[in-house]
């Protein structure tokens, strides 16, 4: 039935709807605790969206960059460790000096982070806030608050917030997780964070749906860059996931 291929007024068999289907954006907004207009729904891999975000910062700069990162004399990146090797490989491939941040039972050593971000060459930090690889550490609320209220010297400092396990709870009842976007906005850092998630740990690894969430100002900026790269992602897969998952529950 052709009607099964329509989401609102969008025909999923056609081009268009760069930032994703309205229903898919609403689903991820519910999952992440943010607003649908802050969500960009892409293809099957959140890692690809992460790579693309760093790549665009490198070639074009971010919203508040004074120049593209490729024109900076030296760039550094904070890497809570032990952590996810594929994260580190992304920033390493762009020539960043990787700085190890020791992990504690409550997340990265924030005393060290707060000192290091005073260096304008430090452009960002990787984060897996829940069940961080490989130790399964969950960031405490205090750690997340301290991250959200950071005052980096670099105007384009970027939190890469990989919320891969955002709806998982391995022990006990589900505990709502702090929304990093609203926390950053609360502390005057609305444009400092890009949050990533996918259904890879929910439906099918390699055949799910991925997204990023960011401020509306960042979204407007990024859409202009992404529009050069792709007309639209796989909306049929997006709709398939919405119809099967239905909601966060």
Label each region the model flagged:
Residues 1-3, 227:
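N-terminal basic, amphipathic alpha-helical segments
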Residues 124, 158-159, 194:
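Hydrophobic "anchor" residues on beta-strands that sit immediately upstream
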Residues 42, 182-249:
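Conserved core segment of the aminotransferase class I/II
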Residues 162-163:
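Walker B catalytic acidic pair
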Residues 4, 9-155, 166-187:
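Conserved core of the PLP fold type I
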């Amino acid at each position: 039935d052709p009607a099964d291929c329509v989401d609102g007024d969008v025909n999923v068999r056609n081009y268009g709807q760069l930032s994703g289907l309205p229903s898919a954006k609403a689903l991820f907004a519910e999952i992440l605790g943010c607003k649908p207009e802050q969500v960009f729904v892409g293809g099957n891999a959140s890692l690809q969206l992460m790579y693309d975000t760093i790549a665009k910062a490198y070639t074009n700069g971010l919203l508040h960059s004074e120049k593209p990162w490729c024109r900076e004399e030296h760039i550094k990146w904070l890497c809570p460790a032990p952590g996810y090797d594929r994260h580190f490989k992304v920033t390493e491939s762009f020539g960043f000096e990787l700085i190890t941040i020791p992990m504690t039972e409550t997340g990265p050593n924030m005393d060290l982070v707060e000192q290091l971000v005073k260096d304008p060459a430090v452009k960002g930090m990787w984060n897996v806030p829940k069940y961080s690889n490989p130790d399964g550490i969950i960031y405490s609320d205090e750690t997340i608050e301290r991250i959200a209220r950071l005052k980096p010297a670099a105007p384009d400092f970027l939190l890469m917030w990989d919320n891969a396990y955002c709806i998982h709870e391995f022990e006990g009842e589900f505990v709502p997780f702090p929304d990093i976007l609203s926390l950053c906005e609360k502390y005057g850092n609305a444009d400092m964070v890009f949050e990533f998630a996918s259904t890879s740990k929910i439906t099918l690894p390699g055949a799910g749906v991925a997204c990023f969430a960011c401020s509306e100002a960042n979204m407007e900026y990024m859409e202009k860059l992404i529009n050069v790269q792709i007309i639209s992602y796989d909306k049929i897969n997006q709709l398939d996931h919405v119809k099967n998952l239905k909601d966060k529950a």
